[in-house]
Amino acid sequence: MKLEAKDLCKSFGQQLVLRNVNLNFEKVHTLALIGPSGGGKSTLLRIIAGLERPDEGNLWLDDQEVIFRERNLLVHRKSIGTVFQAYNLFPHLTALQNITLPLEKVHRYKPQVARETAEEILERFQLAEHCHKSPAQLSGGQRQRIAIARAIAIKPRLLLFDEPTSALDPEITAEVLEVIEELRDEGLDFVLVTHQMGFAHRVADQIALLSGGRIVECGPPTQVLDQPQSEITRQFLAKILKY
């Protein structure tokens, strides 16, 4: 994908969350957003997803400007698959229904086609036996895999992951990261907010570190993680890799 952001700013009340964020990637397959909590990573991701509007600035995906008007955003959101840290599954629906509902209601799939699509993806993710269970009957890892399955069922142009393993224990975290890495290997483009530095190093083409609402450092993993140029980056990595 080609991704460009110019002077993105976003405030919530009196709090300035993004301060003139600029990105320019001619070709990036996997972008990891890292940095301290409250740095603006998730807000930037939500703007890319069309779930938040910037107060100022512009965003382009593959040379197409994202127009932040509701009519345009409805079309944009349909092309983006987003996976949140809290799963965001419908608690009253089964695993299967959590996938078929958006296919039918948002993407206008016929019910039979939606069901076949969902069953195929559940089989691929080794979740077929859980298709009629509610989210409450599933483990955290299973719920997150359902959320990922729902995101890719729409055949998105871009996948967005917002700290998808932050609520999981280490063993389940590894399971979910393996799924994400498989999707990367299959050629899906995605942007990933993560605190998993080892994983970011392995899967990302580019890494951007945000702190205080600004891009502090941006480049390939070998630069940002192995030979950081910014003192803020060095301090962040020293803290997160200490234990």
What residue spans do the PLM features occupy?
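C-terminal boundary and immediately downstream tail of ABC-type ATPase nucleotide-binding domains
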Residues: 218, 222-243
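ABC family nucleotide-binding domain
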Residues: 1-5, 9-212, 216-221
